[in-house]
Regions:
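Extracellular/periplasmic carbohydrate-active domains that bind, remodel
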Residues: 1-460
Length: 460
């Protein structure tokens, strides 16, 4: 592999001089020669405008090296500035999936990669402002995406650390054969929308051994409207990750005009998070064949500005607005999942789209009050007809579903609050199948299981 050291292209690495020209020159020469490695050497801080990564080029950030994003918004690549949508062109749009400003950008760059044990400092606090002690507002724009790679195959991201993202951190869109291996993302837990890893209409993705802390979803599979030309989000493996989020640790949706299928999530630990595992479909896409196994989840409530009410597992499908329709969700399984938090499992379909074939086996769900924030709520946002709804909290809260199987699973209660209630609260469920279920009500003289228009099959 041919090496291109940015110092030989005039980079200073003093943390003050803008080294973008030197880094880009090295990338361009590397690409012209057929590919190789562009090295940011150890011991230097490279302050830089945006970089455009190219085909078969590995941007290698050595251990002890940092590339720091400029605070000057005019120094960022604007891949969608010509889009006939002023909002998208200026600030980006999470539903369309099209970013406004990007720090490291690639398009049609097969074989590109970022590697090394160095650091990408995204300089996020140059683009946000604090709203209160719990929340850094998303109302200050533009906020750049850190890495956006579109229509590029056989790409990889290995070993490096990202800190202080102002917006989404790693967003591959329309890519096939994506490896994300042992990267660290350490974002401010108060900065809204600082997603960790967002594969969007991507296929054959492996996310392995990563540690992510962020103030939005740590890992979020998307099928956004703006990238719908690229097909479904499918064949995804997430394994061996440790995750902390003020939103959902691992989510499918809500951006889902396309389909999601064949997803395996295993051997992950989720701690200090608002939600654990979440499937939220709002734009007509469908989800099928998703398996979660060997996962530990710890949830708690955060400030009400954050969506979610500490549900360890969420499966919902609703219309986002008047112009969208909910999609279908089926064949979802949970094996050996241990969850402890302030709320229970939420499964909520609707009359038009019943959630089908959901299985829990060898799982443990414990509700225990740990924060100062209100209980007795379920958060169904974003959707047309519901918001944050008031209900007693149950270990399993199920609405509009079919063939829900709960096997060899137990529910428990820790520190109680007044809203803690049933082991299972189910309505409009066809075939709720319980086998060796061990669950009691949180309250004396209250049924363990509450059902309404439910066909229940119970084998102790």
């Amino acid at each position: 592999m041919k090496i291109y050291n940015v110092m030989q292209y005039g980079a200073k690495g003093d943390g003050k001089t803008n080294d973008a020209f030197s880094i880009q020159h090295a990338v361009d020469d590397c690409a012209k020669s057929g590919g190789g490695r562009v090295v940011l050497p150890s011991g230097y801080v490279f302050y830089s405008d945006s970089i455009r990564l190219k085909k078969n080029v590995d941007l290698h950030i050595q251990k002890g090296a940092t590339i720091k994003a400029t605070s000057n918004i005019d120094g960022y690549i604007r891949p969608n500035k010509l889009i006939n949508d002023p909002k998208t062109a200026l600030i980006g749009n999470p539903v369309t999936g099209k970013p406004s400003f990007v720090f490291i950008y690639a398009y049609e760059a097969d074989g590109c990669s970022i590697s090394g044990e160095g650091t990408i400092d995204a300089n996020g606090h140059a683009f946000v402002a604090r709203k209160d002690q719990y929340y850094v507002t998303g109302d200050f724009y533009p906020r750049p995406t850190v890495m956006y790679v579109e229509k590029s195959n056989h790409i990889s991201f290995r070993d490096f650390t990202v800190v202080d993202a102002p917006f989404w951190t790693l967003h591959p869109a329309g890519c096939d054969d994506v490896l994300i291996d042992k990267i660290r993302i350490l974002n401010d837990l108060d900065v809204a929308n600082s997603d960790g890893i967002d594969p969007d209409h991507c296929s054959n993705v492996r996310i392995l051994g990563c540690h992510v802390t962020c103030a939005d979803d740590c890992i979020c599979l998307k099928a956004s409207k703006g990238n719908s030309e690229y097909g479904p989000c499918e064949n995804i493996i997430i394994d061996g990750c440790t995750l902390v989020s003020t939103s959902a640790a691992i989510k499918i949706g809500t951006e889902g005009v396309g389909d999601f299928k064949n997803v395996i999530v295993s051997n992950c630990i989720i701690s200090r998070s608002n939600r654990g595992l979440s499937i939220q479909i709002r734009d007509g896409g469908c989800v099928e064949n998703v398996s979660y196994s060997n996962i530990i989840i710890e949830t708690r409530r955060f400030c009400p500005d954050w969506w979610g009410t500490a549900e360890p597992i969420v499966i919902t499908t609703f219309n986002r607005d008047e112009n969208t329709k909910s999609g279908t969700i089926k064949n979802i399984s949970f094996f050996n999942v241990t969850a402890k938090g302030e709320n229970g499992v939420l499964i909520h379909g609707n009359e038009d789209n019943i959630i089908e074939d959901v299985t829990f086996e060898n799982c443990s769900i414990e509700l225990t009050k740990t924060s100062k924030w209100q209980c007795g709520l379920y958060d169904l946002r974003p959707c047309l007809d519901y918001g944050v709804e008031s209900y007693d909290n149950s270990a399993f809260f199920i609405r509009y579903a079919k063939d829900v199987n709960i096997r060899k699973t137990k529910t428990r209660w820790g520190n109680l609050c007044d809203s803690y209630s049933y082991a299972i609260d189910a309505a409009n469920v066809e075939n709720l199948n319980l086998y060796e279920f061990d669950g009691k009500s949180a309250k004396e003289n209250t049924d363990d299981i509450k059902i309404d228009r439910v066909k229940l099959n119970y084998k102790k």
